[in-house]
């Protein structure tokens, strides 16, 4: 990248070299981590703009610093665009991350010790949905729901039983490793019956929701949180959507509650990404993500891998690698050695520890951003199968050649030199 050579290399060759190496990794490896994606040049440019210099504590029109007239425009653009994208009454675009967004909702609506119902991390939930090592699990009394052992899908009758038994102040839906559609309408019915607030963390599926490929939680949830990267293909950051009646409480929870100054350069990048997501081609992109995931999942199943829940409805799949005599940790390492990046992942009712696991998580947003199609997915599945079925140098060489050919055929940022 020219900016590395021109601006960073003369000033800091060590950082420049690390960035250059990461660029090479992204270009010449196949990125299958479900939570990662490749942003547009426009998003990158906005994030690297002069807005990084501006402090802007507060909200548009109500800042604690002068000179905010132009960053106010940017933040208002981001808020209005994302409200239009999801049909929301209120949006806060200041959270630095999805974790910050979730924490802000808890901070706004709960008191320490309040009971919350959230999805078990080992069944596909998220760290911030009550894990005992996270602030959510330390400060609040989380009760976990999971998936049925036979179907590996959420059993809404069990969720209802738990909700009526524990009467939580808040029910949290959403996941980091759940390959099926979530019925937000049903969960809102359960929340109403139990007298609970309802929050949806749609971080992984926000792009699919924006494109109309997954039920939109906004009409059903009191609060919707998300990251702005992943399927939404924006910068790394967070977002909260809510009904107008909760707007003041949410805004106060973010600032001055848990954050100081917003990252205005990131908010600018969010605004650009939301603008991109409002275009018709974004819908087609999301359709390709889902189609690619379906074909990749089916092809891996044909090659003898067990796919958790039998398939996928969204952008990701969980692959049980025990049929290859491997752990998730081993599979992650073997695939990385041939240029395929995945992450080890616990599968429901996993007998292995979270640091070892029996599965890997695979997602298609990043490869779809490179332009890869269903034929490419079949080639990726073949490369994965060869690498994991033939864990020797001969198998690795075959898989590496397949990866190199795909990366050459579908270049990343081809004009960014």
UniProtKB/Swiss-Prot annotation:
EC number annotated for this UniProt entry: 2.1.2.1
CDD domains hit by this protein: SHMT
Pathway listed: One-carbon metabolism; tetrahydrofolate interconversion; Amino-acid biosynthesis; glycine biosynthesis; glycine from L-serine: step 1/1
Cysteine disulfide partners in this protein: none
Site features described as Plays an important role in substrate specificity, chain residue numbers: 229
Keywords noted in UniProt: Amino-acid biosynthesis, Cytoplasm, One-carbon metabolism, Pyridoxal phosphate, Transferase
Reactions catalysed, as given in the entry: (6R)-5,10-methylene-5,6,7,8-tetrahydrofolate + glycine + H2O = (6S)-5,6,7,8-tetrahydrofolate + L-serine
Any one annotated GO CC term: cytosol
Cellular localisation: Cytoplasm
Subunit architecture: Homodimer.
Family as reported in the entry's similarity comment: Belongs to the SHMT family.
Protein's recorded name: Serine hydroxymethyltransferase
Phylogenetic classification of the source organism: Bacteria, Bacillati, Bacillota, Clostridia, Eubacteriales
């Amino acid at each position: 990248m020219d900016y590395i050579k021109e601006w960073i290399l003369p000033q800091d060759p060590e950082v420049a070299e690390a960035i250059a190496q990461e660029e090479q990794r992204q270009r010449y490896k196949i990125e299958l981590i479900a939570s990662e994606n490749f942003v547009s040049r426009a998003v990158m440019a906005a994030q690297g703009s002069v807005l990084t210099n501006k402090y802007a504590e507060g909200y548009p029109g109500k800042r604690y610093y002068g000179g905010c007239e132009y960053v106010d425009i940017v933040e208002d653009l981001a808020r209005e665009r994302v409200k239009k994208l999801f049909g929301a009454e209120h949006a806060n675009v200041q959270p630095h991350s999805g974790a910050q967004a979730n924490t802000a909702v808890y901070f706004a609506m709960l008191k320490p010790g309040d009971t919350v119902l959230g999805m078990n991390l080992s069944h596909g939930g998220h760290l911030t949905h009550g894990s005992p090592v996270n602030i959510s699990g330390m400060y609040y009394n989380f009760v976990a729901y999971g998936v049925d052992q036979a179907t590996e899908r959420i059993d809404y009758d069990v969720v209802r039983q738990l909700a009526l038994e524990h009467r939580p102040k808040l029910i949290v839906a959403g996941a980091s490793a759940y390959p099926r559609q979530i019925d937000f309408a049903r969960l809102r019915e359960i929340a109403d019956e139990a007298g609970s607030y309802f929050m949806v963390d749609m971080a992984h599926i926000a792009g699919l929701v924006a494109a109309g490929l997954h039920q939109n939680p906004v009409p059903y949830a009191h609060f919707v949180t998300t990251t702005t990267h992943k399927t939404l293909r924006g910068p790394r950051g967070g977002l909260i959507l809510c009904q107008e009646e909760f707007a003041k409480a949410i805004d106060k929870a973010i600032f001055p509650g848990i954050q100081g100054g917003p990252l205005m350069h990131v908010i600018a990048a969010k605004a650009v990404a939301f603008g991109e997501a409002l275009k018709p081609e974004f819908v087609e992109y999301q359709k390709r993500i889902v189609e690619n995931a379906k074909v990749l999942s089916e092809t891996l199943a044909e090659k003898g891998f067990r796919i958790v829940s039998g398939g996928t409805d969204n952008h990701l799949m969980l692959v049980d690698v025990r049929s290859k005599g491997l752990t998730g940790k081993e599979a992650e390492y073997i695939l990385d050695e041939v240029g395929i990046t995945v992450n080890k992942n616990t599968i429901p009712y996993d007998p292995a520890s979270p640091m070892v696991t029996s599965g890997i998580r695979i997602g298609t947003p990043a490869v779809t951003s490179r332009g890869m199609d269903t034929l490419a997915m079949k080639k990726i599945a073949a490369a994965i199968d060869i690498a994991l079925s033939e864990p020797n140098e001969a198998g690795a060489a075959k898989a590496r050649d397949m990866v190199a050919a795909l990366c050459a055929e579908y270049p990343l940022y081809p004009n960014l030199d």
